[in-house]
Amino acid sequence: MLPAISKSVLSLDVGKRRIGIAGCDPLGITITQLEAIKRTTFNNEATQLRQLCDLRDVRGIIIGLPLSDLGKETKQSSYCYTYGINIAKELNLPLAWVNEHSSTWEAGQRFKLQNDRSGKLDSAAAALLLEQWLTEGPELEFLKN
């Protein structure tokens, strides 16, 4: 019998002020909302994410892309796409993107966090992204240099 492929991944909801974070166990059963990272410099964010990846034995990164109502690229989705590429290269991890259209609104409704400014809403949105990825994919991919 082949060993199960670890689904220990982090999901990132990349915003202008914070990066919401959620993780799951290696079997992809339990999703945990983690403390959001306050945006500073890329190097500082990468250091914090690397420590978290080491602590949780992370095998991949999921990045939310805030596409438009019609599924088209937006200014923020373009920024998140570039950030995803840069952080995946920095952490040497495969990644996948999921459409996060309305994820923050949905997280606010589902978890009663509509007026949150602490970062809990960002991490709740990241948890929804991870839930979506676990059920729909796509597969993680290493970037080609």
UniProtKB/Swiss-Prot annotation:
Its main location: cytoplasm. Its EC number is 3.1.-.-. Keywords: Cytoplasm, Hydrolase, Nuclease, Ribosome biogenesis. It is an enzyme of class 3 (hydrolase). GO terms for cellular component: cytosol. It is found in: Cytoplasm. InterPro entries: RNaseH-like_sf (IPR012337), YqgF (IPR005227), YqgF/RNaseH-like_dom (IPR006641), YqgF/RNaseH-like_dom_sf (IPR037027). The keyword Hydrolase applies. GO terms for biological process: rRNA 5'-end processing. GO terms for molecular function: nuclease activity. Belongs to the YqgF nuclease family. PANTHER family: POLYNUCLEOTIDYL TRANSFERASE, RIBONUCLEASE H-LIKE SUPERFAMILY PROTEIN. Could be a nuclease involved in processing of the 5'-end of pre-16S rRNA. This is Putative pre-16S rRNA nuclease.
